[in-house]
Structures are given as structure tokens and as C-alpha cells.
A protein has these predicted regions:
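Sec-dependent bacterial lipoprotein signal peptides
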Residues: 1-21
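Bacterial lipoprotein signal-peptidase II cleavage site
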Residues: 23-33
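Extracellular mucin-like PTS domains
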Residues: 34-68
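Beta-lactamase-like hydrolase cores
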Residues: 66-102, 201, 205
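A short, well-structured edge-of-sheet supersecondary motif
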Residues: 84-116, 374-377, 383-385
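Short active-site loop at a secondary-structure junction
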Residues: 90-94, 110-168, 213-226, 294-297
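Short, surface-exposed loop or secondary-structure junction motifs
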Residues: 161-366
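Short, gly/Ser/Thr-rich active-site loops of penicillin-recognizing serine hydrolases
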Residues: 393-415
Length: 415
């Protein structure tokens, strides 16, 4: 069968997979969990001060003294038994967790089973906050006005003259989202690793075949879908750079990331529907090179990579001495835009730009189809990234067991 035909034939499986994730079905249990190995890293700052006395004719100068503040100490020992029991009960191949704190950096980094610091995992929708950040960076640089029509940037934007980039990255464009039909015909290019991002976005934005299904922007929350392809294409036009180059320039180089990149994996990898494609096995070379990465769900990372991005969000947009995002852009990403713009909510959750906003506890998250759960507690100044290679219900179930444990460990910091 020709490769293109095989890719298209995979779309019904993709549709079933995405619907299952939305419904929160339980993951099936497999065999026994592999042997557990853990790596734990604690990082805390040192404060150095110098005091020098005055030299007199009757006494020698006192030596310079250095006072080192006690290192911050966190107790995360409650986490491992919970995770070990969970992966054994679900038959998982392991898990990874990194916790970062605004002042202390990486305060916990642990892996179980087959996972380790170098393991690269597909993260599905946990890609969205990464994408939103690229557009906000271009906004910071004056290359893109996220509140102006797409048509101001891209010639093909005239197809939907009222839609802005801010609409796209808040799932508020009025274009057809993932549901109820993830394999929506007019937008099928978003899941194919053939063609280009520009070509796909132009097709999505100009096709007349969706006319009966689209609505005005900022009138209804429609999660996911090809609006994210359009967002990436707008970023390419505004910057004059490819998506891969933008990822490298904005995130990889300043933040020292090891693996972050995008592809379009959904129709390339064989595996059981509804679950992580085990055939990827931490190896991006299993994917064909593509000029049409899937932006809403096509990234892959290590735990350390995602932790660095979370820390950047906590440290006012800085990676080391390099500014990645402005404070103003971060505030917009983290705020509940859909409630502010048109009074929408989704079962008690709001949505910013790439982030779900829990309207009850203020926690923001960007969970993925395959079991990744990143979260930030902006008020208390910490964040965490949890990864299992399973499905969304499984990742969310484990995260639910860890939210309070992580919070208590951070709150109990000493030193």
C-alpha cells in the first residue's frame, strides 16, 4: 500500500483514540511493571555574603568571612511508594516526575521502571503551552500582534478575516475543533506528515467545505484541532523562520534543552488504540522527517526539558540570563481568557493560552492524550511534570494521587 494511503487509512484509529481520551476511559492493565530504578536530584541555592572589618594600627585586619545559608531541604520520600504501587497495578513500563520551584530550581527529579533522565516521550496535547509560547514570543518581539487578524500577516488569512492568533491559541477561533469528529475531512492534513505546515494552514483557512460548521470567534470553546496548525503557520510567516528553527531559537538554545522537537506521529506509529505507541520507544528516528509537524500534539521531550520550561514560566520568563517570554505574555497565557472574553467554562475549568485553568484551586495544567500531566501552582511558586506512557485517564489518575503530596513537600521546605 502506498505510504500516503496507509497514513490516511490510519485516521479512523486516530479518531477512536482521541474520542476515548476525551471520555476518560480506564487504561487496560498489561503485564508486570519492570524493575524499579530511581534517580533523585535536589538543587538548592547558596547565599553568600562577605563582611570585612576595618584594619587598625593595634590589631590586624580580620579575615574575610563567608556565610553560607543552609541549603533548602525538601522531603519527597512519600512519592516513590505511591508511584511504584501505581505502575505495578496498571502494568506500566515506568514513569517520570520532575518538580521545580521558583527560587530553588529543580528540587526533585525521579524515574521508575524503564524511565530515566534521557528517555524521550511523546507528549501529545502537552505541546500546546509550548506552541502558545512561540506566538507570544513573537508578540513580545513586535513581529506579530496576537490581537490583530491573521490576515494582517498571511495572505491566505483573508479566508477568515475576523480570526486572530489569540483566538487560535485559546481554542476560540470558531473553526472546527477535535470533537465530535477528530478526523474531520476538510482539516485532515493536520494529522499527515506529508506536505507543509503552510500548505495545511492555507487549506484549513480557505476551504469552503467547513462553511456550515464554523462560527464567529469568541463565541464557543472548541478544543484543539487544526486551529493550532494555523497558529504555527502564522508564526512561520511572521518570523520568516521554520517551526523547527523557532523551537530551537526560542526554547532549545536559551534553556539548554536536550530533545524538544515536533513531528507528526499520529498516523506513523503502530500500536494499540487509545494508548501510547510503544513502538516509538524513546527514539525520534522512528518518525519520518516532516515539514508539517502536528502542533497541538506532536512534541516530544525528556522530563528535564519540560521541567526547564516550567521553571521558565515560574521565573518570569527567564532561562538563566536569557529572556524567553515577557511577564505580560506569561500573565496572558496563564489567565482564564475564555471566561474573560466570552464567559465560557468547560466543566469548571477555564482556558488561557495553552493552559487549562482550574477555576476552583487556580492550578493550571496542560495534560496530554498519552498520560503526560504538567502543572503549575503560580501562587506557591512551584510546578511539576509527570509522564507515563499510557493514556490520559491513567496519567490523570496518578497525578490525582500526587497533587497534594507534591504540594505538602514544597510547603514543608526547610532551610
Amino acid at each position: 500500500m502506498p505510504r500516503t494511503a496507509r497514513l490516511v487509512a490510519s485516521l479512523p484509529i486516530l479518531a477512536a483514540l482521541l474520542v476515548q481520551a476525551a471520555c476518560g476511559g480506564d487504561a487496560s492493565s498489561g503485564g508486570q511493571a519492570s524493575g524499579t530504578t530511581t534517580t533523585t536530584v535536589g538543587v538548592a541555592p547558596e547565599t553568600t555574603t562577605s563582611t570585612t572589618s576595618t584594619t587598625t594600627t593595634t590589631a590586624p585586619a580580620e579575615p574575610t568571612t563567608t556565610t553560607v545559608a543552609p541549603a533548602a531541604v525538601y522531603d519527597f520520600t512519600a512519592i516513590s511508594p505511591i508511584v511504584q504501587a501505581f505502575i505495578a497495578s496498571k502494568g506500566l513500563n515506568g514513569a517520570g516526575l520532575i518538580v521545580v520551584q521558583r527560587d530553588d530550581g529543580v528540587v526533585h527529579h525521579e524515574h521508575w521502571g524503564e524511565f530515566g533522565p534521557e528517555r524521550i516521550s511523546l507528549i501529545a496535547s502537552s505541546s500546546k503551552m509550548v506552541v502558545a509560547g512561540i506566538l507570544m514570543r513573537l508578540h513580545d518581539d513586535g513581529l506579530l500582534d496576537v490581537d490583530a487578524p491573521v490576515a494582517d500577516v498571511a495572505a491566505w488569512g483573508a479566508g477568515n478575516p475576523e480570526i486572530t492568533p489569540a483566538h487560535l491559541i485559546s481554542n476560540s477561533s470558531g473553526l472546527v475543533g477535535l470533537f465530535p469528529n477528530p478526523a474531520y475531512g476538510p482539516y485532515v492534513c493536520q494529522f499527515l506528515p506529508i506536505g507543509t505546515l503552510q500548505g495545511c494552514a492555507e487549506k484549513v483557512f480557505t476551504t469552503p467545505d467547513d462553511d456550515a460548521d464554523i462560527i464567529p470567534p469568541d463565541t464557543e470553546f472548541r478544543y484543539g484541532g487544526a486551529q493550532w496548525q494555523v497558529a504555527g503557520a502564522v508564526a512561520e510567516v511572521a518570523s520568516g523562520k521554520s517551526w523547527a528553527d523557532l523551537i530551537d531559537e526560542v526554547y532549545v538554545q536559551p534553556c539548554g534543552l536536550e530533545a524538544l522537537a515536533f513531528n507528526n506521529p499520529f498516523t506513523q506509529l503502530e500500536g494499540e488504540p487509545y494508548r501510547y505507541p510503544a513502538s516509538f520507544n524513546s527514539d525520534p528516528s522512528t518518525l519520518m522527517a516532516t515539514d508539517n509537524p502536528n502542533l497541538e500534539g506532536g512534541a516530544y521531550v525528556t522530563t528535564g526539558d519540560y521541567g526547564a520550561l516550567l521553571l521558565m514560566h515560574l521565573q518570569e520568563g527567564m532561562c538563566g540570563d536569557t529572556r524567553v517570554l515577557s511577564v505580560e505574555s506569561l500573565e496572558r497565557m496563564h489567565s482564564d481568557r475564555i471566561m474573560e472574553a466570552y464567559g465560557a467554562d468547560v466543566g469548571g475549568s477555564g482556558y488561557g493560552m495553552g493552559w487549562w485553568v482550574d477555576q476552583e484551586n487556580g492550578r493550571i495544567t496542560d495534560g496530554g492524550l498519552y498520560g503526560t500531566v504538567p502543572w503549575l501552582d503560580l501562587e506557591d511558586g512551584y510546578g511539576a511534570y509527570l509522564v507515563v506512557e499510557a493514556d490520559s485517564p491513567t496519567g490523570n489518575a496518578l497525578a490525582g494521587l500526587l497533587y497534594d503530596v507534591v504540594e505538602e513537600a514544597v510547603a514543608g521546605r526547610t532551610g
